[in-house]
Amino acid sequence: MGDELDHIRKRLKDEGEKTAAFFEALSLEDWDRQIYTAGSGWRIGDVLAHFISAERAYQVYLQDILQGGTGAPDNLDIDQFNEAEVATMSGTPAELLETYRQVRQDTLKFTANLKDEDLSRPANHPWFDDKELGWYLKLLYRHNTMHRMDIRKSFKSGAPLPHTDEHRTGRNIDPQN
């Protein structure tokens, strides 16, 4: 088995554990803190719900890619999808954490059947356009890491953040601007 596929599996496992530990360490008061100002003003629980819904969607897209499809539909409005999906999810912090762990386990099971050559299969992403299946898998752990950084930044500043990449990269991703 190739080094890249092993690396991706390890990062998915390790970053999944870090994400779960991060959310487990939060107090109940923290769970009600608003993190983003855009859209519905996601709170901590909404961010974890977003991880769950996004990863579930990626699992469908990844399977589609393996079957010769392109992944995410070209016309997917990612912001609308995220808002709609998060709005349908509810649960206690413990329930959301358990669901997150199960979804990550499902992703790890998916990777168990991959071959090295699968990583280069062409794939579409609604925000990043044409990529490859391996890139999608890496995005699963990078995505969560970026949001955890946002949560820490919001906690440190004591204020919610705009949902942009400006505080990280200088690139504004807010669809309203």
How would you describe each model-predicted region?
Residues 1-18:
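Extreme N-terminal tail/first-helix region
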Residues 32-79, 122-177:
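Short, contiguous alpha-helical
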Residues 13, 17, 21-25, 29-36:
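An N-terminal domain-cap segment
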Residues 80-121, 135-138:
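Acidic/histidine-rich alpha-helical segments that form the ligand environment
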Residues 16-24, 55-59, 63, 101-115, ...:
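Structural signal for well-ordered, non-membrane alpha-helices
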Residues 25-31, 112-120, 156-160:
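Surface-exposed helix-capping loop/turn segments at secondary-structure junctions
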